[in-house]
Structure formats: structure tokens, C-alpha cells
Amino acid sequence: MTVTPRYLDHGQARRIYDRIGRYQDTRPLSERRAMDEIAWRGDFYNAAAVLEFGCGTGRFATRLLETKLPAGAAYLGLDVSPTMVGLAREALAPWGGRTRVELSDGSTTLPVADGEYDRLLSTYVLDLLSPSDSETLLDEAYRALRPRGLLALASLTPGSTPPSRALAGLWKGLWRIDPRVVGGCRPVELAALIAPERWRVRDRLTVTRSALSSEVLIAERL
């Protein structure tokens, strides 16, 4: 019997992440390593304006502001969860007018001007979105970024070792039955979503810890 995938709608995703709240910061080792790679490879030292789609609690933005971003760099975070938005605003309050965190209605259409940003960051979001929403988000990222701006992504991904492939298969099987069981996320291949006529992939790697794999991808807007 074929099970038709059922992606979470925006309301379901909002409720899940409202419940998760601060627990989102207790990430598995593979996710923490993926975030380390993005911080290192995203050339944030030279960024002037950063947009994060799915900012969560603001923990990664805090790290960037403390250790990577220039003193004058601006930051905008968007999230579908009111709980996450509240936590992120609290975390980023020390940076005052340099930062904004806004509640998203769940749309992947970005409320920003063309070419307004030189870094666009989205981690563990594309593995939650439907294919059509993912396509829209990447179209919007292309619109929002300046030429040579960088897109930084991380996602759950199919494994590269026998244990990680087995876990990814089990995870995707559970997701097909009921995506809420796994928080709405499933393993995806980020590189397959990137249009080569629009983006040049600068870095791509898979990080595996305890059989859980994440893909990290940095692409330059052409």
C-alpha cells in the first residue's frame, strides 16, 4: 500500500514549535556540528545584512552577533511560532535597533525588498516544508539576496553510512505515516533543490553523529 506524504500545514507547524520552545536548543550532536559548519563557512565576518528564515529561539543569531558579524551588521529573524519569536526577541534585546524578529504567517514569501540582504540563513526548515513551499522559499531567497550574496542551509538528509541510511529510512517511514511523530521533518537532499543557473555551490558536506545525518550547503547567488 502506498502512503501519500502529508506535509504539516502552517498551523500544525506553529503548534509543534510553540510546544518545543526552549527545548529546541538541546539539539542532537549532528545538528550542533552542522551549525558550527555554517558559522565557519558562511563568511559572516563580511556580512552587512542577515535574514534568518526560521530563527527559532535566536540562539544562533546571538552566536553570530557575539562572534561573527561586524558591529554595523543588521539582522532580521522570521519564525512561524509566537513562542519562538518571544524567545528570540528576548535573546536579541542587547543588540537593540540592529535586530528585528517578526512573526511569520507561515508563508514562504519573504516580506523584504529585492536585494536587501547579503546573507540568507535557514536551518532545519526545508526538511519541514512541502516541495512547493521549498521552491517558493528558494525563489524568494534569490530575490532577496544581492548578487554574490550567500545562502546558508542545513537540513536532515539521507545517511552516507549503513547505520545512518537505516535511521533515515526509519525516520522517513514514520514521517509518511504521521509527520507529527517526527516534528514534521524528514530527510531531504538540499543540493537537488538548488538551480545551477541561479546559484554556485561553494560548500556542501554531510555531518553524521550517532547515525543522524545533516547536510550543510553554502551557495552564492549568481
Positions of the model-derived regions?
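Class I SAM-dependent methyltransferase SAM/SAH-binding core
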Residues: 51-53, 57-108
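Short glycine-centered segments of the SAM/dcSAM-binding site in methyltransferase folds
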Residues: 49, 148-150
